[in-house]
Amino acid sequence: MGRRKKIVEQCERLMDNPEQIRNIAIAAHVDHGKTTLTDNLLAGAGMISEDTAGQQLAMDTEEDEQERGITIDAANVSMTHEYEGDDHLINLIDTPGHVDFGGDVTRAMRAVDGALVVVDAVEGAMPQTETVVRQALREGVKPTLFINKVDRLISELQEGPEEMQERLLSVIGDVNELIRGMTEEKDDIEDWTVSVEDGTVAFGSALYKWGVSMPSMQRTGMDFGDIIDLERSDKREELHEQTPLADVVLDMVAEHFPNPIDAQPRRIPTVWRGDADSEIAESMRLVDEDGEVVLMVTDIGVDPHAGEIAAGRVFSGTLEKGQELYVSGTAGKNRVQSVGIYMGGEREEVDEVPAGNIAAVTGLKDAIAGSTVSNEEMTPFESIDHISEPVITKSIEAQNMDDLPKLIETLRQVSKEDPTISIEINEDTGEHLISGQGELHLEVQTQRIERNQGIPVTTGEPIVVYRETPTSDSQEVEGVSPNRHNKFYITVEQLSDDVLEEIRLGEVSMDMPEQERREVLQEAGMDKETSQDVENIIGRNIFIDDTKGIQHLNETMELVVDGLTDSLEDGPLAAEPVEGALIRLHDARLHEDAIHRGPAQVIPATRDAVHRALIDADIRLLEPIQDVRIDVPSEHMGAASGEVQGRRGRVDDMYQEGDLMVVEGIAPVDEMIGFSSDIRSATEGRASWNTENAGFRVMADNLQREIIMEIRERKGMKTELPESITHF
């Protein structure tokens, strides 16, 4: 029997025993060694050769991943590991580390119960480390820590036992500070922090395949002195044989990560807001393989032979070929064509996948990342809220008009596979817009369209995504319908930062129970009366109905919301989305005859009123910003900080870390386009840097008019602003 077939059979045998299952993700900052570590785990499980582990990068299956040397797509694999006499099934997802592909990390966290956070011993916790820890904790996923590249402390930095211990404890302290800061409201904070003593921290070198933890040192009798001696003597093979990395890490996974039976009762209330007393809730809590089928789709991929593959977590029931299942948000049922598990880049079909496992399913043609799939209609899972959002846009056109239909179909597929990509299709002009997390994100997607689909495309220069926001409160504005028979009286106020943050994080929505929504809004600072009158949440804005007993308003309210939505999707400055507005409807006068208060009357009246109220509330343009961190030798520190400041940026901190200086600051995304080549040139290639999207800020008044005019011209709008705009 082939090795691969044997492993698949072992996995199938363990699938029915959720106590022996561990669903985990490996997550880290870019280049901290996740995929090299995953190679070691695959070799330890007998899935690839130990000789090639670390160089094979078996989970980076796409050509561009191998070329660039980074993980772009999250990749799944199932493996087995024996721990304390019991076989365990480990379903592992290797996630990207580059900030532009953070959406894959967010989606992976919904499918797993444990996150193995990898940190470079030399660099320490970095911006994306903080992001992945935050993503894990928001999803109720327990972290453990692997500190990688310890060999560099010994061989490159020549650190002794005391210096090493100090540095490693500093890394652990930084990670625990992140965990504590994000779990303040949990009662079991100590259960979430990691420590050497309890075995939730391991150290080692993924490149040289050795690792240690407190339990492994107690078992083998090795200490850090022995490790330093063997590493300095270049006896790395002996070190690997005495304390192999895969055993140390997989033992930690089996011992400290929860199995689905322990995890699901705790996680279900976090990710699902349905009736907690229902049969389906009980079935998910119990991980009941005989219950109703419930699958949460976390990823969509395309196989050239099998078509679309939906990957996700089976929370209840058993998935089988031929089942007819509902997909949330769509009509009718989809028929399951096949079910399987992942073996790195390949999918292995199996007869069934029971609750508690991660499955690969074909036939769910209507599913997208975030879909709830079930054999009975049910309350869907909470949407997967991505921490970052699109900040860069490019136009994309087919070079040959014959390819236009295929390009449109491909773009729609791209946005289905990657929800952090936003697509705007204009079938009239043939020019389409693709928006993503950064330059690399868009570059990878456009190259894949050309390479995988064979469509030559032309892309425009990167364009930054802007927003509009009120900066004060407006006077009451009257909106009048074209027939003069309907009037609406509206004001606009600023939403507080805390309320806006709750909306951005998905903590408050119209999908949640009304009482719960009120409580969240009041905790964020909204007064009780206002929280009780929330009529709708439109994007990142809140609509309050302050009216009392207006005749015919109930049957007209849907049109009022449509008008508000129109006005907020295209703000009055540059037709950019509006955020941070609280719109109040104070009064209305409606014609008694429904034919005179239809869409053509109500929508323009409310849209116009909101736009004029926004202008009166001193609406301004918001620009996206990025946190910037540059690690550079001290002689180039001035050049590095100059690169940030010369881009309308601000340097917030400069400090020494090891033999390098660290420059930390903030800069507008628009000015950071082309930063890579400029920072290399300014520092003679000696700098390493990281950027992370940090939301939006109000653009300086002296730049507002110029940028607004550029946007309006690009969109084919009039290049003069309404006369009433006088606040900048």
UniProtKB/Swiss-Prot annotation:
Keywords, in A-Z order: Cytoplasm, Elongation factor, GTP-binding, Nucleotide-binding, Protein biosynthesis
The tr-type G domain is annotated at 19-261
Where does the source fall among the domains of life? Archaea
Q: Does the keyword Cytoplasm apply?
A: yes
Residue(s) carrying Diphthamide: 596
Molecular function (Gene Ontology), one example: translation elongation factor activity
Cite the binding residues for GTP: 28-35, 94-98, 148-151
> Where located?
Cytoplasm
* Database matches in Pfam families: EFG_C, EFG_III, EFG_IV, GTP_EFTU, GTP_EFTU_D2
Which InterPro entries does the annotation name? EFG_II, EFG_III/V, EFG_V-like, EFTu-like_2, G_TR_CS, P-loop_NTPase, Ribosomal_Su5_D2-typ_SF, Ribsml_uS5_D2-typ_fold_subgr
SMART domains attached here? EFG_C, EFG_IV
The record's comment on protein family reads:
Belongs to the TRAFAC class translation factor GTPase superfamily. Classic translation factor GTPase family. EF-G/EF-2 subfamily.
Instruction: Tell me the function of this protein.
Output: Catalyzes the GTP-dependent ribosomal translocation step during translation elongation. During this step, the ribosome changes from the pre-translocational (PRE) to the post-translocational (POST) state as the newly formed A-site-bound peptidyl-tRNA and P-site-bound deacylated tRNA move to the P and E sites, respectively. Catalyzes the coordinated movement of the two tRNA molecules, the mRNA and conformational changes in the ribosome.
Q: What is this protein called?
A: Elongation factor 2
Species in which this protein is naturally found: Halobacterium salinarum (strain ATCC 700922 / JCM 11081 / NRC-1)
